[in-house]
């Protein structure tokens, strides 16, 4: 009986750790915790969604509500610089990676703090993401050059360094406190 109980507890623990890797939102907002918002736009200025970053116990919870985007699976990341200059949003820099890890949740030396689950956009042009990144801080996110939420043209393979082969940048928004 004791072995069965231990096996069940082990399976439950593995199941909960899998929640973190699949993008399930597990953070509880802190009383008085900081919040930042990024309004996402395409290169032609079309509004395609809103990302939020909310301080939670032990990390930051990131959410995205996307609209008017091309159907399919798209890589999504937090990038190091709070700039979204068209046409390619290259000014957003690379992935937010204050801990110096490799890219991807499937990489044994990863992930970056800016690595998020893929964004799945339905035929109605809508999709959502919700994930808590343990150890991430609002001070790091909202540093002197801020940060940006970027959506890519292709899916992230969750492994290839530095960007998961996720293609060009199709939407970008700069995080602002408040």
Where do the PLM segments sit?
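C-terminal motif of bacterial Sec signal peptides marking the signal peptidase cleavage site
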Residues: 15-18
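Sec-dependent N-terminal signal peptides
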Residues: 6-12
